[in-house]
Amino acid sequence: MTDSTCALSKDAVEPGFALVQAWRPSSALNPGLARTLRLAQSVIPSLRGEQGGVPPADALCLGSDAALHALRDHWAQAYPEAGALYLALRCLGLAIWQPIYLCVIAVHLEGAVPQLAGLAQPVKTGFPGGFHLPVHAPVDGSFVERMEAAAAEMQAFCNAVRRALKPLVVLHDRAADRLQAECVLGALMAVRAHTSLSAADVIAMGEAWLASLGIAGGCGFFAYRARDGTPALALERKVCCHHFRRRDGEKCSTCPKRSLDARIACLLAEAS
């Protein structure tokens, strides 16, 4: 996970989020979906998914704004000094990173692509952690077919989140595009260790993902040498998350406000 996404995760229906009340436990779990959930957790252990059952009443889910209001209020009260831009990107990033990682991991590890419309994310002390999905048959097929399905799911989900957030926070479209792009490429970086993708493959796949989502150029990669001299990649982020404006914050190691040399120095220091 990237430094900014680690901060997020810590240790088409009506736009918005809803409190889930209508689900019922089911013994008829879908095996394809179960496999996808296992794959996701094998890459990111905190990405714990369940199918069926009833998620907590305060879970984030497409359809109404109640839980999103609570998320906004939590972070506004926790760090009022960080400002409006921090608040907007914090809420957006927290709401979208898990479904984005789930979809990208599914595509690259040959899993079936889940539908995101019914996804609910339990929230604890301001952090969505894990998720619930209704029992359903995810989309299988060739790599291209699964990538197209995943892009459509992510685009619909993220657009709905953004529509719901805009009345609540100061969210600019370009910044939102760039944060979404960062999450997608962060997921690609995370899954790379579980594949045979070369650096060139990762760069090409990153461009393909962002193009499929209509956010081309929103994030990229830069190459550097690790401490042992081996080539490495890091995210070339295009938007600052404003974490440094918090009373306990500092600039992320790959913050676009840092020079390239400073970003590389931070990455090397973190690896030591």
What do these predicted regions represent?
Residues 1-88:
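Generic N-terminal leader/targeting and pre-domain segments
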